[in-house]
């Protein structure tokens, strides 16, 4: 597992810590990993989103919208470490891993791809034009 940004002292020997880096470098570094784990405080949900971009299954809590949307088979309830461990072990099964990987890629394309974003912004701009 890796961490970026702020590392807690008790994590020193548990995780490989990556120094802060620009997003362009980060997204390339992330692509080298097989599974994402985000069992900490939920924030903007970008880690879950970035994992999905690469087709990397992410085990995380259900209090992140991007997690619930993009990784339905690897989402656990807040604090459910037992289920998170079971999912981590299940991801060792190639068929389950591939199912999760393909599903998150598909969901990313449907919900968060550049095409979806551009259409969303276009709709907003058109609705603003209609109100003026």
Predicted regions located by residue number:
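A charged, aromatic-enriched C-terminal amphipathic alpha-helix characteristic of glycosyltransferases
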Residues: 92-126
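Short acidic alpha-helix that forms the nucleotide-activated donor recognition element
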Residues: 22-33, 53
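Short glycine-rich donor-binding/catalytic loop of glycosyltransferases
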Residues: 41, 56, 60-67
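Acidic donor-binding loop of glycosyltransferase active sites
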Residues: 31-43, 56
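Short, hydrophobic beta-strand segments that form beta-sheet elements in well-ordered domains
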Residues: 1-6, 36, 58-60
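Nucleotide-activated donor-binding/catalytic signature segment of Leloir-type glycosyltransferases, i.e.
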Residues: 2-24
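Short alpha-helical segment that forms part of, or immediately flanks, the ligand-binding pocket
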Residues: 27, 46-54, 67
């Amino acid at each position: 597992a890796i961490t970026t940004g702020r590392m807690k002292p008790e994590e020193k020997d548990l995780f490989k810590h990556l120094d802060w880096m620009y997003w362009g470098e980060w997204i390339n570094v992330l692509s080298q990993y097989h599974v994402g784990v985000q069992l900490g405080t939920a924030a903007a949900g970008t880690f879950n989103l970035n994992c999905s971009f690469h087709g990397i299954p992410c085990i995380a809590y259900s209090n992140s919208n991007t997690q619930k949307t993009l990784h339905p088979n690897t989402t656990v309830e807040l604090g459910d470490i037992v289920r998170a461990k079971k999912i981590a072990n299940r991801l060792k099964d190639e068929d389950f891993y591939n199912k999760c990987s393909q599903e998150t890629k598909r969901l990313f394309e449907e919900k968060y791809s550049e095409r979806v974003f551009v259409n969303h912004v276009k709709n907003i701009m058109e609705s603003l034009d209609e109100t003026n």
